Design a protein with these regions (language model features):
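Small-molecule-sensing regulatory modules
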Residues: 20-65, 72, 80, 99, ...
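Short, structured active-site "lid" loops
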Residues: 69-91
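Extracytoplasmic loops/domains of multi-pass membrane proteins
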Residues: 85-86, 97, 102-107
Length: 328
């Protein structure tokens, strides 16, 4: 064996040993992000006894810029940029995200190594005044940072006033309790994961409020070239959840959507069949125009399904709504 071949072989062995001995997980510092990273850490540790798994907690621009609407400062990519930099710089091996916070298209350097089994995808009403949105008094102020939620709220409940709210789950609850809002809308799964079930006044059904693409799913991101890391996290992947969120994200990608536009999408496996049904929505910010479309197909055609539903929405005039939103 030549010296060059020997050096390469030793390098590859060292890489395998390094991966086998430890893995570092990049995560945001918010309580919910830490919960998700700890969840992934526990799963990896369970599957790989003896492997050292540690968190690399980071602050992101999205966590720091709390005085402006996300739609006006660059969208939810602000929550992942620092974590991706940690992967590229070698400070972390994987990054854990809420899938709904990730852009539809990743940089060529990265891939989704796993989508964990999805949790509750629905939104929740949190208020100290009523158990339902319809029972809130006219003019009641409802807080949300999501244009998707704003659009659907105003369409179904025009008697309400919707205002921007930023911060992590506990910060938003504090603002509600402090009287700045009469109610707020949050993802049910976030409250459940933080053992805040008691704060949920009512869970909003899929028919009441269609979720964001990927809502409720935890994503594990890694570098495309890290084959050993991809093999390590592959057992965390849930096949059906992966197909469903692929269909949802495909709709959003077809519409060039991100958190700066009111797009909703939710796919689920049809009971007793080998098909997933996909529902999607595009709405104006003031809720005066809501477009809906749906279709179904086998899981392996998830991306094609999403493209078809996206085309249906475009045929209904979604491009006009989205161009109007972009000008605001």
């Amino acid at each position: 064996m030549g010296n060059k071949t020997l050096i390469i072989s030793l390098f590859l062995i060292a890489e395998v040993i390094n991966v086998t001995e430890s893995i570092r997980i990049a995560t945001r510092r918010s309580p919910l992000a830490i919960w998700q990273a700890d969840f992934v850490k526990a799963k990896i540790s369970e599957l790989n006894p003896g492997l050292k798994v540690e968190l690399v907690a980071m602050n992101t621009k999205g966590d720091q810029a709390l005085d402006a609407a996300l739609s006006g400062i660059g969208g939810k990519g602000l929550f992942i940029n620092e974590l991706e930099s940690a992967l590229l710089d070698g400070h972390a091996d994987i990054a854990v995200h809420s899938l709904k916070d990730m852009p539809n298209t990743l940089s060529e350097d990265f891939c989704l190594g796993a989508v964990c089994a999805r949790g509750n995808p629905c939104d929740a009403l949190v208020t100290n005044l009523s158990s339902s949105l319809k029972n809130l008094k006219p003019g009641s102020v409802v807080g949300t940072s999501s244009l998707r939620r704003r659009s659907q709220l105003l369409a179904a409940h025009p008697h309400l006033e919707v205002k921007e709210i930023r911060g992590n789950v506990n910060t938003r609850l504090d603002k509600l309790d402090g009287g700045s809002y009469h109610a707020i809308i949050l993802a049910s799964i976030g409250l459940e994961r933080l053992n805040l079930h008691h704060r949920i006044s009512s869970r909003l059904s899929i028919k009441e409020m269609l979720p964001a693409p990927g809502q409720g799913a935890i994503a594990v991101q890694c570098k495309v070239i890290d084959e050993s890391i991809k093999s390590l996290i592959l057992p965390l992947h849930d096949r059906i959840s992966g197909f469903c969120v692929a269909a949802e994200r495909s709709v959003s990608a077809r519409l060039n959507g991100n958190c700066q536009v009111p797009i909703a999408a939710y796919a689920e496996l049809v009971r007793g069949s080998n098909e997933i049904v996909l529902r999607a929505m595009v709405g104006s910010i003031d809720g005066t125009s809501i477009l809906c479309a749906q279709d179904r197909d086998c899981p392996n055609n998830a991306v094609k399904l999403g493209n078809r539903v996206g085309d249906k929405l475009l045929g209904l005039g979604a491009d006009k709504i989205l161009s109007d939103v972009a000008r605001i």
